Amino acid sequence: ATVWGIYPKKDVPTSGNVFTFTLGDATQSAQKAELQNTMHMLAKGTVNGTTVTNLKFEHLTALYQFKFTNRRPDAYKVTKVVVSADAAIFPKTLTVSGEEKTYGDKSNSLTLSMTSLDMAKNEVAYGYLSFFPMADMTKDTELTFTATIEKVGDSSSTETIEKKGKISELYNAESVVAGDEYKYVAGKRYGIAFMLVADLGYEETEAGKYLVKKEDGLINLASEPTVMTNAATVITLDADLDMSTKEAWVPVTEFKGILDGNGK
């Protein structure tokens, strides 16, 4: 006799050895991956008396892992990520009958909504989204990953970060995707990284050397203890700075004296 194993368990009995699984847009709270209801698996085994043998589960879904890194001075939160394509390559249903898999209710996008996914400066956060991989994808399939973020405590600061390109552009030749002929495969995880970068007003031209481009750049550098306490740090201006409007830089008293520029 044949026995079937299904994960996660179904409350409604399945008849005729035909199994239907559903996926759609997902919601994640904080950094807890809500995968227990979306990582669908199916197994077929044999019953010998009271023993079940050869029961091996097959993954039916693949997984996006979104990595967010906040390099901005303020705390930010991610509210959602949308994966979209020109073609409808994201099915919401999968029906398995014997060796045959049939995908239905295809869409050109999937959405992961997130609550309480906050990141302080330099913190990293992750989001997870399960999906049914299809054979329709090729190296020329264009995908767009759009993350919506906002500053913590300021709902009016909403903005988006976008990563877009052909599959062959988003994943290099050494990637798992390239090894699978630029197709997503069930049971595998695919990483997509987003970086929240701020215009700090300065750039590090080489180790320990900084070029300040505007007033905020000098203020931001001054707030970096590892930079300011390093005797080898060299800070150069590429323009005159007017600090008179910067409250954080108003001197408590007037300075008078001679500045020793080391002869330069």
Predicted region positions:
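Short, surface-exposed beta-strand/loop "edge" segments at domain boundaries and coil↔beta transitions
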Residues: 11-17, 74-75, 88-92, 138-139, ...
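Short beta-strand/loop motifs in extracellular/secreted proteins, especially
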Residues: 74-81, 141-143, 233
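Extended low-complexity, serine/threonine- and proline-enriched intrinsically disordered segments
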Residues: 76-103, 147-149
